[in-house]
């Protein structure tokens, strides 16, 4: 399986915008992640697209090695735009890996912590 490209989607929801990354593979599996470009990180979409371009042809199931490559090629600042872009890419790669293995992503991260959650609206 290899990364072939990405698509970014933006949706206005009235009180905030939602942004999504769709990471595509040659096997037809698409990984999806959400990121936030609404507050202070204008340009995040461009950084995500540029970083994905450097990983075309790589196996997204090797997400840790790819994350290390991205870390090495970018200048890091805590909570900075590069870290936000890398997080969106890594989340999409984890989604791909979970789909390929037929397991939820939380199983890849050590298992579920709870089986229900209280909502406030």
Predicted regions and their residues:
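Metal- or metallocofactor-binding catalytic centers and their adjacent structured scaffolds
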Residues: 26-101
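Active-site-adjacent beta->alpha loops and helix N-cap segments on the catalytic face
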Residues: 108
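Structured beta-strand/loop patches that form or line metal/cofactor-binding pockets in enzymes
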Residues: 1-32, 36
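Subtilisin-like serine protease catalytic core
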Residues: 101, 111-112
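Hydrophobic faces of well-ordered beta-strands that scaffold small-molecule active sites
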Residues: 31, 115-121
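A short, polar/charged loop/turn motif at coil->beta-strand junctions and beta-hairpin connectors
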Residues: 2, 113-115
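Broad gene-expression machinery/nucleic-acid interaction feature
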Residues: 18-20, 88, 118
């Amino acid at each position: 399986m290899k990364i072939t490209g990405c698509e970014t989607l933006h949706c206005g929801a009235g009180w905030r915008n939602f942004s999504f990354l769709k990471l595509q593979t040659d096997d037809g599996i698409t990984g999806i992640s959400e990121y936030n470009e609404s507050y202070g990180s204008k340009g995040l979409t461009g950084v995500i697209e540029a970083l994905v371009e450097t990983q075309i042809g790589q196996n997204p199931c090797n997400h840790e090695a790819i994350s290390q490559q991205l870390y090495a090629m970018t200048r890091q600042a805590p909570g900075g735009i590069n870290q936000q872009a890398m997080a969106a890419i890594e989340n999409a790669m984890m989604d791909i890996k979970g789909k390929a293995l037929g397991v939820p992503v939380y199983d890849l991260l050590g298992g579920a912590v709870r089986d229900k959650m209280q909502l406030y609206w």
